[in-house]
């Protein structure tokens, strides 16, 4: 690194002072404020952590801005004056209670380099009476700011979330807090405070130097911010089952340090260290005398205020192998800096056999929390490999904010915590990876006034006591899903690039590898068992079979069944029907592709937890929810989907991972009870239902009438779609056992499925034994017959587009001449149970 071509912290200070010297002398009668500031465009995230302990103010507010040719007219409302987060943008504009805005005019701007610029602007009061005429021109931002103010200078670290325009009739505030792609835009500003007299440059320089030392943890003369870093060493996971096939030629093993990556250039002018957790370079004095520079990549830890640098790779000068790199560092880079010591590690190898290296790893791994690195000593074009006892992964997490509350903190029975959504990276897009709880303790604090989280004692090995991150950040997780610590370097990458943690496929590979023990990699039987486990997904009815086609043809049966479900859900979500004004909390069992998501939206529920054993159906449902939620996002209910079956003894604990306490007002079990309701599952199913259903809660069930099915003597075929060929236009039902039928609908199913026969007497008896009372029971044909007059007449008056289309579909479905729909509808039944 050539320091002569890079701006130092002192250069930024001088640029700011130089601009300030050009500002006119203050006039006491002048109502105009002269603002001179230095702005870092993509500041290191760590600077928030260094600034916060000395903050003179911390706050969040909504900023309203109208911009026109270098002029900004601004107003703001402190977030403490806004109740709840579900206000639409237009409502936020209506909350403005001051017609006196601030007019900011840009006089001069100079971009110093890619990371910083200086600006001189004037500020004055501006009476803006008719601002509501310019709603579409008003830009709204949520601003979180931490400020340190000294005599002549203020330092502001800001996170800005773009909310959209003032004309938008949607709640962007809640959306940006909850959506992973709505990232905060950070900035770091050093502003000179206007006084009645011009401040002398020496005083300013002294204050700015002190502030730079505070913020960047080094003298400004030794700070270089404009650095583009690319990791020179690629290290990838070596799957344990690949160990027996790895090339042993020149293969060596060394331990991995729990430090931070550092790219170092050593010259006779100084040692330049780019720290990955800081994302900038610090220069250190050196006694190194050679005219040839040395560049290396290593891992750094801090002990007694001295950096210990462990060599990973020598970049320049180039030598023939890794052992010569090690020798070079040992000979040339010893005792050249008081603040830094260069070290090398012991290399184990070479290996004569795979069993030898496996024996070594079996001994090493339990005592190495960060794992080991395998590398080839010759300079072949291959990455390094890592193996860990605990395959940690990096995920983007987003704290969850709820519909009405401005506080995400949840007060549990024995703990206080934040709930978060976890994401992995799917080719630059966030992929939902479940939810979790972040426990609030003395070492983890939620900073509610600036929407940030402070972690203590997680980076002590590198000399940092406190780390502060926004409510959206990248964190390291253990193989069991426990949050270990925030990743500062990866959070920097998330904020400024399209990065959401490890790629999803990499996460899956890490988790699968975790199930293999290092000592089992030569045992073919155990590896075979693991492979069989992945091939046979335990949650599917038959792991080798896909039961449903991707292209389903919806006919009259599907449309009319959907009508029945719509009535059922609307009725039991109604606040007036049950005289209950509270929004319902819903548990949906075997929810499938999520065809009823929209019904519950119109039912105005507060939350829905869905379960299903089929991960493919879960994926399609989540896609559907995200699509529905992309329009009026913040008004959609909270939704979680977990892969689980009601037949499992772990069902309740799995649900509790996302629904921490309380019980459900509604349990939705549509067209699926016939896969689980059998004597061998009664106890488990009913215990799960009892545990999760609130007193007075309702269980909504739709299924086929077992009493009618039990009377079948041979295969019965119903024509259900007159527009399809005869090979696809039917649904067949065949009794194959006293308690089982075989159902096949070729228009939507790839093969027949077995279902249990659910008889009314058995259903009501078992439910009654567990405290559930049958309060409603009706066949589909009865509901449709009662609804025909309404569908064919009164519903034609409906004008709302979506509802109008809904009834038009049902009117067409009722014209099902030439089919057996009426007969088939007799076989479908609704049960509603209420918990005593």
UniProtKB/Swiss-Prot annotation:
Keywords: Hydrolase, Magnesium, Metal-binding, Methyltransferase, mRNA capping, mRNA processing, Multifunctional enzyme, Nucleotidyltransferase, RNA-binding, S-adenosyl-L-methionine, Transferase, Virion. The record marks 74, 104, 123, 156, 158 as: Essential for RNA triphosphatase activity. It is found in: Virion. Residues 552-836 form the mRNA cap 0 methyltransferase domain. One of its GO terms (molecular function) is polynucleotide 5'-phosphatase activity. PROSITE patterns: RNA_CAP0_MT. S-adenosyl-L-methionine binds at residues 541-542, 565, 590, 612, 670-672. InterPro entries: MCEL_GT_NTPase (IPR048425), MCEL_GT_OB (IPR048426), MCEL_NTPase_sf (IPR046429), MCEL_OB_dom_sf (IPR046428), MCEL_TPase (IPR019602), MCEL_TPase_sf (IPR046430), mRNA_G-N7_MeTrfase_dom (IPR004971), RG7MT1 (IPR039753). Its EC number is 3.6.1.74, 2.7.7.50, 2.1.1.56. The active site is at 256 (n6-gmp-lysine intermediate). Mg(2+) binds at residues 35, 37, 189, 191. GO terms for cellular component: virion component. The record marks 599, 624, 674, 755, 828 as: mRNA cap binding. Residues 1-532 are annotated as: Triphosphatase-guanylyltransferase. The N-terminus contains the triphosphatase and guanylyltransferase domains, whereas the C-terminus contains the methyltransferase domain. The N-terminus is involved in binding to the termination motif 5'-UUUUUNU-3' in the nascent mRNA. In the N-terminal section; belongs to the dsDNA virus mRNA guanylyltransferase family. Heterodimer of a catalytic and a regulatory subunit. Intrinsic methyltransferase activity of the catalytic subunit is weak and needs to be stimulated 30- to 50-fold by the regulatory subunit, which is itself catalytically inert. Catalytic subunit of the mRNA capping enzyme which catalyzes three enzymatic reactions: the 5' triphosphate end of the pre-mRNA is hydrolyzed to a diphosphate by RNA 5' triphosphatase; the diphosphate RNA end is capped with GMP by RNA guanylyltransferase and the GpppN cap is methylated by RNA (guanine-N7) methyltransferase. This is mRNA-capping enzyme catalytic subunit.
